[in-house]
């Protein structure tokens, strides 16, 4: 589902139904920041119920980890929320029944499988805010049923997005100052952490220093990026949530799930360096309350296709439309990241034009596998496919 469409509520309902059935639940998030946020929200959601909830992350002290391990093994913990720490060998569950994975494409298949194997007959719900077209979803997750939330929460306003050619904030600096003076908070997104001689791009460190100096004595500026330790990231995010920091300069580490309703303005430097779906994810961090959100895209790109793509974002804010456009102009590897997509380049097929064929083929494939294991049919064909796959072929002729 799209950014802010209510996926977490769907997960919460599933986790509660699982709890009522007497099973333990687990929710896995890709970052400690997001895991902590889920923990805080769900603890509040379930506070009226007799439900024991724990947060398990890699940065916990050994003593705290052991207490959680014991609670999971004895069954005194009903729901655990965490990062990859949830599927380590040292973690044992008494009766795990339901697993939720947030941001599906950020975890490897082996990681998801390891968590699912922590119990018998575990139900599995995976969620992603990258609203990929159904055809691509079926190709990536062909062994799962795919559901889409295509509506927005009532009353949520569209993000107003404006693209500026250049790398200066001057065109909207007055608006930014006025917004901050009214108590608002702002994200400033950069493609790099540090300056790179080979890449003439704005770095988070450089922009952080410039903004700290410019707004000194008026507003507090914070810095967030992937190279910080988890404790440092959590501290910066908490300060931003508590409005101790008014301007947060960051890389795309804030792309996933961060929720600060008071932050309703975002500036993205070198916007041409990001995929459209990635920018859509980023701007989904703002406008989460009842206030109007503003996103300013800065780019010095001179090529027309790049300009056209950024202008497209000014006019469109439906995540499914954007991802479809992104997929057509950049390809599936770019949409999800080459390492995550796991989708081979089709030698002949077209993921849009051949949707009906893809769905029909999927139905036949499921039937063939079922008949193979139940009746021994299609044995030669299945064995031939197994050999082809082992050789690493991207297609079968």
Q: Whereabouts are the PLM-identified features?
A:
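Inter-lobe coupling/hinge segments of SF2-like helicase ATPases
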Residues: 1-311, 397
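Accessory helical-bundle/CTD segments and flexible terminal tails appended to RecA-like ATPase motors
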Residues: 238-247, 254-261, 266-269, 284, ...
């Amino acid at each position: 589902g799209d950014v802010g469409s209510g996926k977490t509520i769907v997960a919460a309902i599933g986790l509660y139904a699982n709890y009522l059935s007497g099973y333990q639940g687990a929710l896995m998030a890709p970052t400690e920041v997001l895991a902590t946020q889920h923990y805080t929200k769900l603890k509040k959601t379930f506070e009226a119920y007799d439900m024991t909830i724990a947060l398990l992350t890699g940065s916990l002290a050994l003593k705290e980890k052991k207490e959680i391990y014991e609670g999971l093994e004895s069954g005194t913990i009903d729901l655990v929320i965490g990062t990859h720490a949830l599927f380590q060998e040292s973690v044992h569950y008494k009766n795990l029944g339901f697993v939720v994975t947030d941001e599906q494409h950020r975890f490897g298949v082996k990681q998801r499988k390891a968590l699912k194997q922590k119990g018998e007959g575990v139900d599995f719900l995976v969620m992603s805010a990258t609203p990929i077209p159904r055809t691509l979803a079926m190709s990536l997750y062909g062994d799962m049923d795919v559901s889409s939330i295509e509506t927005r929460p009532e009353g949520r306003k569209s993000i107003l997005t404006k693209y500026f050619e250049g790398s200066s904030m001057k065109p909207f600096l007055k608006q930014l100052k006025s917004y901050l003076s009214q108590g608002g908070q702002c994200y400033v997104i950069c493609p790099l952490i540090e300056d790179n001689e080979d890449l003439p791009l704005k770095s988070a460190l450089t922009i952080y220093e410039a903004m700290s100096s410019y707004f000194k004595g008026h507003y507090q500026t914070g810095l967030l990026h992937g190279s910080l330790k988890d404790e440092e990231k959590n501290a910066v995010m908490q300060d931003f949530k508590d409005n101790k920091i008014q301007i947060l300069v960051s890389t795309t580490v804030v792309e996933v799930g961060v929720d600060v309703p008071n932050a309703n303005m975002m500036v993205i430097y070198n916007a041409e360096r990001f995929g459209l779906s990635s920018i859509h994810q980023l701007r989904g961090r703002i406008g989460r309350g009842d206030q109007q959100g503003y996103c300013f895209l800065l780019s010095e790109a001179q090529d027309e296709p790049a300009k056209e793509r950024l202008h497209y974002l000014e006019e469109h804010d439906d995540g499914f439309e954007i991802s479809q456009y992104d997929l057509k102009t950049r390809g599936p590897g770019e949409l999800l990241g080459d390492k995550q997509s796991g989708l081979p380049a089709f030698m002949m097929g077209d993921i849009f034009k051949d949707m009906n064929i893809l769905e029909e083929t999927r139905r036949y494939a499921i039937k063939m596998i079922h008949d193979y294991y139940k009746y021994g049919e299609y044995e030669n064909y299945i064995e031939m496919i197994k050999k082809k796959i082992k050789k690493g072929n991207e297609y079968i002729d």
